[in-house]
Amino acid sequence: MKAGSHGIVVPVNASEFIVLSDEERKDIIRFTVEQAAGRVPVIAGVTTQSTYQSVEFAAYAGKIGADGLIAMPPYGARATDDEIVEFYKRIGDAGRIPVFIQNYVPPVGTVMSPSLCVRIMQEADYASYIKEETQYSSQVITEIARLAEILPKEKYLGTMGGKAGRYLIDEYHRGVCGNMPACDIVDIDAKIWNLLEEGKEKEAIALYNQAIPLMNMEYMYGYVLYKAVLKKRGIIDCDSVRVPGGKRLDKFDYTELDRILKELEPYYQV
């Protein structure tokens, strides 16, 4: 929040949700809601291997005051379209708060067509946002918006991008309502967005161009890289990841990371 984040989303892909215990997940959601204290929205990640488990997490998140939910369809076994629609109905009904439909690639994600995303919003009461991260995501964002024109305005509240913010400028031109990157350079990500909203596109693009090398590394290494950046910034003490984890950084990666961060350091807020 000190870095200027407009909201907090936990625990999801960038926060290693897949290797957390059920109690750890609940602790993270509760702690975040308590610390945010209503200053920014908190969106609780409730993706699991089954609808039953996700419903349990959704109910918990709604009970303790989370502002919304985000979920990919269950990844234990691939669900049918009808099962996916039912999944989003049930987690929304359990939490009774707005739901982000996360469209993400395998193995953890399930790629959903734009028409399926719109169908979910039609049939699931609380599903009103999309987080789009599949292949050709920018064009998918545009197609979802086109198909969603049939919905009442209150049923489609917008799409957000992801993918470490690599396509943020293009996404903005396509009408997204935000982006959900990792937290390691949230001050820079938020600054780019704020500049765009202020009509200062040239400044936004200049900062974006400086951040792209790090965004590319983020996309390559995922949470291994996020944690390395957070440690180098003095925000966390340990950058270990749980097994199974991603590819570890080597000495060349660290040299490149140091070079990139030195150029971005003037833009840090914390």
Which residue stretches match the model-derived regions?
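Structured C-terminal cap/extension of enzyme domains
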Residues: 1, 169-270
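N-terminal cationic-hydrophobic initiation segments that often serve targeting/anchoring roles
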Residues: 1, 33, 92, 121-122, ...
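Active-site beta->alpha loop and helix N-cap motifs at the rims of alpha/beta catalytic domains
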Residues: 1-109
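General structural feature for long, well-ordered alpha-helical segments within catalytic domains
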Residues: 24, 28, 53, 57, ...
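Conserved, mostly hydrophobic/aromatic
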Residues: 32, 61, 91, 130, ...
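Residue-level recognition of short, structured coil/turn motifs
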Residues: 37, 96, 125, 152-153, ...
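Catalytic alpha/beta core domains of metabolic enzymes, predominantly
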Residues: 105-219
